[in-house]
A protein has these predicted regions:
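Feature marks short, highly hydrophobic, charge-poor N-terminal signal-anchor/signal peptide-like helices
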Residues: 1-5
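Short juxtamembrane and helix-loop transition motifs at transmembrane-helix boundaries
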Residues: 6-8, 27-38, 67, 88-93
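N-terminal signal-anchor/start-transfer transmembrane helix
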Residues: 8-28, 74-75
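Transmembrane alpha-helical segments of integral membrane proteins
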Residues: 23-30, 76-90
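Core segments of transmembrane alpha-helices
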Residues: 43-54, 104-111
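Short alpha-helical packing/oligomerization segments
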Residues: 56-79
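Interfacial loop-to-transmembrane junctions
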Residues: 83-106
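Juxtamembrane boundary at the C-terminal end of a transmembrane helix
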Residues: 113-119
Length: 119
């Protein structure tokens, strides 16, 4: 289970990094839009991500299981730390697109390397 969680975290980094690298303007717009969502609503959505991710992970195997655990991990961030996530997104909105792309490339590189090494 630890390996699946590690691979899910690597997949999460790779996906989120790819989104920011290839579509930085869209990512900034979505992060700015998230500032208007109440913390409680973000927490409930996070808990739904956790529940759905764990149900799918229990029913599947292989890469789908890893992807489902990645959804549950993202739900954990939004479900239990909504204020922190909004604060991080607010900081990302304030930075330039080139800086955002650097952070995205870093996340994509770490995630892709971990997936290549450990899957």
């Amino acid at each position: 289970m630890i390996q699946i969680t590690f691979l899910a975290f690597a997949l999460f980094l790779a996906i989120e990094g790819a989104i920011v690298v290839f579509w930085p303007a869209w990512a900034k717009k979505k992060m700015a839009d998230m500032q208007g969502v109440p913390d409680r609503a973000l927490g409930v959505i996070g808990l739904l991500f956790i529940a759905s991710g764990l149900v799918v992970a229990g029913l599947t195997d292989g890469i789908i299981k890893i992807a489902a655990v990645a959804v549950a991990l993202e739900g954990t961030l939004y479900g239990f730390l909504p204020t922190l996530m909004k604060r991080l997104m607010a900081a990302a909105v304030q930075c330039s697109e080139s800086m955002l792309k650097v952070w995205g490339e870093t996340a994509l590189g770490i995630g892709a390397a971990a997936l290549a090494l450990f899957y």
